[in-house]
A protein has these predicted regions:
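Non-catalytic terminal/linker segments enriched in charged/polar, low-complexity residues
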Residues: 1-122, 128-134, 156, 161
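P-loop/Walker A NTP-binding module and the surrounding RecA-like catalytic core of P-loop NTPases
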Residues: 114-116, 122-332
Length: 332
């Protein structure tokens, strides 16, 4: 998964989701952890004071300790529901009179956090011809920028990439994607502002197939998620995609701003009601102490986190690895 951007030969396409346990693999994982550790420092600091007091020496844990940890996790935006799921088994054991040391608690917390994060069930890019990624999200989450960063990373990995400007409503949206296309060296298919988004996607996919593109990234409008018409338009767009690409050949990716914390969950709920969501990208993780929202989103909707944004540069959009993520915010 760590060389996800590198183009695979046809002989190994079926093994995209199975990383090889080789020295380069472990080196990439080590590097990824260090990037996570640096980029997630604000979330780690949010938890650090409370956890340090509990884990400073190996001792027996009390209900008061768990209450402090519970408050700290909620403030880091795991949310009440997810925090309850994580801590309830531990609270139950304490209430039954079982002794739990701080070392054991830390191990159980780490295991519990890992279990909250859902693993992908299919490779990315998918097996579509072309593989198609359909991006959703409200305005301001960094959707267009994220698409451009992914386009560059996949292009640099050897893929023939096309971006499609499906946001025809927001003023300047098409020009923004075109500027990004010029900057990262990836072509953009676009029509005029106000054009039917479904028609743009139809023509874009037709172009991609005829011209041999391997990966298509589709931008969409991001007006307020409370707007009924936006959701209906998204449904229409997915029907158009399915005229070209089978369901297993494309992925609907919801882009969320980690800074919004629990509001990201309400956004996800609205999109989830409209069309199937296959995975999530969390942006702006480096600028927030609310990194716990990753656990809340993945656990509540049973969705994998595909990437997280830890900076402004394309290389700061990193493939998500749950072991590195948990280790970065809850050190061993």
């Amino acid at each position: 998964m760590f060389n996800i951007f590198k183009r695979k030969s046809k002989e190994v396409q079926s093994d995209l989701a199975k990383p090889q346990e080789t020295e380069p693999f472990f080196e990439e994982k080590k590097t990824l952890f260090l990037r996570f550790k640096e980029g997630l420092s604000k979330t780690k600091e949010k938890l650090a004071q409370t956890l340090a007091e509990v884990f400073e020496v190996d001792r027996l844990i009390t209900q008061a300790d768990l209450e402090e940890i519970e408050e700290s996790l909620i403030l880091s935006d795991l949310g009440v529901e997810t925090t309850f799921a994580l801590l309830e088994p531990i609270k139950r054991d304490l209430s039954l009179g079982k002794n739990i040391t701080s070392k054991e608690l830390k191990n159980r917390l780490r295991e519990g956090l890992l279990n909250l994060l859902v693993d992908p069930t299919r490779p990315l890019p998918s097996q579509g011809i072309p593989a198609t990624l359909f991006f959703l999200g409200v305005n301001g989450v960094g959707k267009t920028t994220t698409i451009a960063k992914l386009a560059k990373n996949f292009k640099d990995g050897g893929y023939r990439v096309l971006m499609v400007a499906g946001d025809t409503f927001r003023a300047g949206a098409i020009e923004q994607l075109q500027r990004w296309g010029e900057r990262v060296g990836v072509p953009v298919y676009a029509q005029k502002e106000g054009a039917d988004p479904a028609s743009v996607i139809y023509q874009g996919l037709d172009k991609a197939i005829k011209e041999g593109f391997e990966l298509v990234l589709i931008d969409t409008a991001g007006r307020l998620h409370t707007k009924y018409n936006l959701m209906e338009e998204l449904k229409k767009m997915t029907r158009v995609i399915e005229k070209f690409i089978p369901q297993e050949g494309y992925e609907n990716i919801l882009v969320l701003d980690a800074n919004t914390g629990q509001n990201a969950i309400s956004q996800a709920e609205s999109f989830f009601k409209a069309i199937p969501i296959h995975s999530v990208i969390l942006t702006k993780m480096d600028g927030t102490a609310k990194g716990g929202v990753a656990f809340a989103i993945s656990n509540k909707f049973k969705l994998p986190i595909r990437f997280i944004g830890l900076g402004e540069k394309p290389e700061d959009l990193l493939p998500f690895d749950k072991e590195s993520f948990v280790k970065a915010i809850l050190p061993e």
